[in-house]
């Protein structure tokens, strides 16, 4: 079995919010004890509703927020701890494609400078080599070389996201975190960007973490899927196991919401739909965080948090009644 490219061990990210003058200081548990791994060349889908902690987890992996607890290993090297990680070294291994192509690009920089700056910063090649890599990367993402001196406002949303993808890949990283990479784009071009990401994954040997609330996208691109709810992983496994045999009520609720007749098996299970809205991470429910919305909860669920345990080879679920959900 291949060594993990990325390993997270009991990772937690907490923020202090409020003030002593406004009701006191509270702790927001954005990420709460996450253990995950990503293999080289693999695509891990990370799904859940807004507010589940997916983007905060991504920022912790990138070194943009410091974890409160736990360890992060990238390529066998621990990057978490008391000191901030070496951002220069991290950038050569892990990169990120952001959700909003309109906000993630510097409006004062041309495409050429946007792509060349990381190469200059890391001392990659001379002027001719930098230019060659910029033009080559533009071609890889479907941009015309003669547009290298244009500014972001001269491109469509889909083209801007292609620039963002090119910027993420220009240093040839091993892992790319895609944070809702198509949610801000027109429906008509979402498939183009997803297919581009898949082509680049195969061509460059990339591993992805694909963050999305759109399970249709995740099913299409992922080898494995992790389901996150209020900072915790509640289920993970191979994409086929997750979509065809979900063993957590929250996963079933997400699948039931897909407007796709091929997934009606999960949707027609009695009580598949979740009740109400996601709770606040400032005041999560005791026990299983999903219990206020769960259609099969019992008294145990309100006092004891279930452990993420195996239900099949490579398939884990955190539910006291995981064995009943078959």
What are these regions (language model features)?
Residues 174-177, 181-185, 189-267:
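P-loop NTP-binding/switch modules centered on Walker-like glycine-rich loops
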Residues 151-155, 159:
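Conserved ABC ATPase signature
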Residues 128-146, 255-256:
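Conserved ABC ATPase "signature" region
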Residues 47-48:
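The feature captures the beta-strand-to-loop junction immediately N-terminal to the Walker
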Residues 62:
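Helix-to-loop junction immediately C-terminal to a conserved catalytic motif
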Residues 20-25, 79-95, 121, 127-128, ...:
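ABC ATPase NBD coupling module
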Residues 2-4, 18-22, 27, 238-326:
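Short catalytic/signature loops enriched in Gly
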């Amino acid at each position: 079995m291949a060594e993990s490219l990325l390993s997270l061990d009991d990772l937690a990210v907490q923020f202090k919010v409020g003030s002593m003058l406004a009701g006191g200081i509270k702790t927001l548990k954005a990420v709460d004890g996450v253990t995950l791994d990503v293999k080289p060349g693999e695509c891990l889908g990370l799904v859940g509703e807004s507010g589940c902690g997916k983007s905060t987890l991504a920022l912790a992996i990138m070194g943009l927020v410091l974890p409160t607890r736990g360890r992060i290993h990238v390529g066998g090297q621990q990057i978490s701890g008391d000191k901030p990680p070496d951002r220069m070294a991290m950038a050569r291994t892990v990169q990120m494609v952001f959700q909003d192509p309109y906000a993630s690009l510097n409006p004062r920089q041309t495409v050429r400078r946007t792509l060349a700056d990381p190469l200059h910063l890391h001392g990659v090649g001379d002027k001719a080599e930098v230019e060659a890599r910029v033009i080559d990367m533009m071609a890889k993402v479907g941009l015309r070389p003669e547009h290298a001196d244009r500014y972001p406002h001269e491109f469509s949303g889909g083209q801007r996201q292609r620039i963002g993808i090119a910027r993420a890949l220009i240093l040839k990283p091993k892992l790319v975190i895609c944070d809702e990479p198509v949610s801000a784009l027109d429906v008509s071009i979402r498939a183009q960007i997803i297919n581009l990401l898949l082509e680049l994954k195969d061509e460059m040997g990339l591993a992805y973490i694909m963050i999305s609330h759109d399970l249709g996208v995740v099913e299409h691109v992922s080898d494995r899927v992790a389901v996150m709810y209020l900072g915790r992983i509640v289920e993970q496994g191979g994409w086929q196991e997750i979509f065809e045999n979900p063993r957590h009520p929250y996963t079933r609720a997400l699948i039931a919401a897909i407007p796709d007749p091929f997934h009606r098996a999960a949707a027609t299970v009695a009580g598949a739909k979740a009740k109400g809205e996601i709770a606040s991470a400032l005041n999560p429910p005791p026990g299983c965080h999903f219990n206020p919305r769960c259609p099969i909860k019992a008294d145990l669920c309100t006092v004891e948090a279930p452990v993420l345990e195996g239900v099949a080879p490579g398939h884990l679920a955190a539910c006291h009644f995981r064995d009943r959900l078959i």
